[in-house]
Amino acid sequence: MPNIIWIPFRETQAVDLITGLGDTIEKQLNQPRDKFTADLKTANDLRNNILNPQPNASYLDHLTKYYAQLTYWTTKFPAGCDSLEFMWYGTLAYTANAAPVISQSLHFERCNLLYNLGSLYSQMGVNEGRQDADGLKMSFNYFQMAAGCFQILIENGLPDLESLNMRGLEYDTICCVRDLMLAQAQECFWQRSLLSGSRNSLVAKLAQQVSLLYDSALAWAQKSPQVRSEWVHHMTCKRQHFLAVAHYRMARDALDGCRYGEEIARLKAALNAIKEGTGKGMLRRYLVESVADDLNGIIDVVTEDLKRAEKDNNLIYLQSVPQTTALAPITPALMVKCTPPVELAKPIEFLTKDKLGLPLFVKLTPFAFHQALVLYSQECDKIVSSIESQLKNCTNSKNQALVEMALPGSLDSVEKPKGIPADIIAHSDQIKSERGLETTREAVKDVQRLAATARQELEAAKAVLDDERSEDEMLRRKNNSGWTRFDSKEAGAHLYTRLAELEQYLADAGASDKLVRGKLDEIDYLLSILNSGRSALENYLPSSVSGVRSPEVKRQVPHLRDLLNNLESLEIKRAQYMDRLSLKQQNDDIEPVLEYHMNKLIREKHANLRLTLADFEPITSKELEKYTVDQDWASEQKELQEEVLEKLDVANKDFRSSLDMNDAAIHRENAIQSLEVAYFSYQEQKDHLDAGRNFYNQLLGEISIFHKNCKQFVYERKMEGASLEHELSSMHLSEHEHSGGHSDTSSTPLAAPRAQRASNLSMWSPEDGIRFG
C-alpha cells in the first residue's frame, strides 16, 4: 500500500440537460429551445461522459471538455437554472455518501468538476511508478496540477458558492487537500534528490519544507468537518517524520564537517520530533503499513547513529553537545507551486475545433442581457412609483389642508343651504361605482389573511430552528467536550439575524394594519351613507335657512370657489399625467438598443466575450434620462399647489370672518365636512390597503425562501452531527480496544480513507529511501 494519499472522486447522478437547459432557455431566457437542439444533445452527452470516473487520460479529456464548456455556459445562463438539479455526493467524511448536496447552480456543478479534476490528477500522481527519477518527475507534476485545480476552486469557485451547498467543498477542506498535494509533490522532489545523491544539507532543507507543507495541510484538516481522523493521523506522522529526516540529514552534514557535538544534538532532535505526537500506540493503529514502516525505519537508523555518535564523542572527540533548542533553524527549500493545466486556467480560450471543441450555445442571448432588461424595467418602476408617490402626497396634503380649513363644507352650506352639494354627489357616485364599502371590507380581510399566513409560515420556520437547537443541546450534553462544533446560534447566525428582521417586519406591519383598521372603523358609518345614495344623503344632511348674504360674502364666495376649482384642476391634471406616464412606460422598449450595443461589443472584442451587467449600464443609464422631465414636472406640482393653498387659506379666513351663521347652518356645515373628511380618508386608506396586500405578498415570498433555507440548514447540521458522532464513536471504540487488552501490535493498521480504488497503485518499498532519511 502506498505511503501517500490520493483524493477520492466526488460522485454524481445523471441529469437530463436536454430538458433542464431547454426549459431554462424557454422560461428564464425567453428564447426558443428548437434553435439549440443540437447543442442540447451535445451538452447532455458531455455530462454523461463524466458519470463513471476513472484515473486515466480518457476521463481527464472528458472532464476537461465538459469543464471548459460549463465555464462558457455560465456566461450565458442564469446562476440558478430553475429546471435543473445537480446532485453530488461527498467522499471524504465518514457519512460522505449518506445524502447528496443538491443545487440548481451551474457554478456548483463547475466547482464539483474542479474538485474531481484535482482528484484525478492526485490519483494519476499516485499511480505513477516512483522508483526512478522519471516516475518521480511525473508524480511531482501531477500533484502540482492537482494543487492547481484546488487553488482555482479556492480563488474562482468557493467565493461565489452558495453557503448551503458547501458540504464537502468547505474552504478549510479544499485548502487542506491543496496543501496535501503540495506536500506530496515536495516529497517527490525530495525523493529525487536522494536518487541523485544531493548533499545532506540540501536534502535536509527539502525535507524541512515537506514537513512544513504537511503541517499546513494538517492545520486546515483540523478545522474541516470533512477530513477523517485517519488522514489527520497520517499527516501528523508525515509532518514529524520529515522533521526528523531534516534533523537526521543535518546530523550527517555535521558528521561530514567534523562537528560531532552538533551531530549528537541533531540526532536527539530527530528522535524528539518522532516522539512528539507520533509515539502513541493509538496513532499508529491509524497508519497504513508503509507509513508505519517508514516511521520505524527512521527511528532505527537515528537510534543506531546516536549510539555510535555518543560513544565516539565520549571516547575520541570530546566535543560539547549543544542543547537542541540552541540549534540553528533549518532553512526550508520550497520547490513546488500550484500549477493548474492551462486548459483549466483559461478554459474558454481553448474552446476551438482542434482543442476542446467549439463552444455550445454561441447564439444564445446572454443572461446578462436579460438582467439588463429586468434591471431597466425595475429602475423605471422605481422612477414612476416615486413620481406617483409625489403626486399622491400632493393630493393628501391638499385633503389635509381642506380638512383644517373646514372646506368645502362651509362654502357648500352657504352656496346650497338645502339639498346635496355637487361634490358630495360626485363622491357618492364614485364610491358606489367602486363598491367602496364592500371592497374596503374585503381588502381588510385579505390583508388579515395574508398577515396570518405570513405569521404561520414564519412560526413554522422558527420551529425548525428551535427543534435543531434543542437537538444540538441534547447532543452537546451527551458528548460533553467532544462535541466541538459551533452551537446552533453561531452556526446559523445569518438565519437567526434574518428571523429577527422578519419578525420585526411583521410587528411593524401589524401596527400599521391596526391603524388602518381604526381609521376605517371611524368612517364606516359615513361611508355607508355615501355608499347608500341620495336618499341616505338627504336624510343625513340637515337643511339651513337661507339668509341674506352680506356684500363681503357675496364677493368672497365665487373667489373661494375658484380657488377650490383650481385645486381640483391640479388634481385632475396630476391624474391625467400619471395615465400618460404609465403609457409611456408601457411603450418603453429598449431591447433593440441593448441588442445593438451587445452586438457592437462582440464585434469589437471576440465571440467568447463574457458579458456582464456592467457592460450594459452606460446604455440603461442614458435611456433612463428620458424620465428626468417627468421627475421635474412632479416636483413643480408641489410648488404650484402650495401657491394655491396659501391663497385659499387667506381667502377662507376672510370668508369665515364675514359669516354670520346660525345653529342650523353650523350643523349643515359640520355634516357636509364630515362626509368630505370620510371621503378623503377612504381614498387614503384604500391606498394603504393596496400597499398592505403588496407588502404581505412580497414578504410571504421572502419568508418561504427563509423557511426553505432553515430546512436546508437543519439538514446540513444533521449530516454534520452524524459525522461527528460517528467519529467520536470510532475514537471511543479504538480507545476501549487499546485499553482493554487488545494490544496486538501485529494487527493490521487502519488504512487511509478512500471512496474508490485507484488502479495500478505502486508500492513504496524501503529501497525508495524514505525509511533511511
UniProtKB/Swiss-Prot annotation:
Chain residue ranges for the region called Disordered: 726-758
Gene name of this polypeptide: RIM20
Taxonomy, superkingdom: Eukaryota
Record-given protein name: pH-response regulator protein RIM20
Organism in which the protein naturally occurs: Yarrowia lipolytica (strain CLIB 122 / E 150) (Yeast)
Subunit structure comment from the entry: Interacts with RIM101 by binding to its two YPX[LI] motifs.
General function of this protein: Required for the proteolytic cleavage of the transcription factor RIM101 in response to alkaline ambient pH. May act as a scaffold protein that recruits the calpain-like protease RIM13 via VPS32 to its substrate RIM101.
Biased composition (Basic and acidic residues): 726-741
Domain BRO1: 3-398
Gene Ontology cellular-component annotations: endosome
The family this protein is said to belong to: Belongs to the palA/RIM20 family.
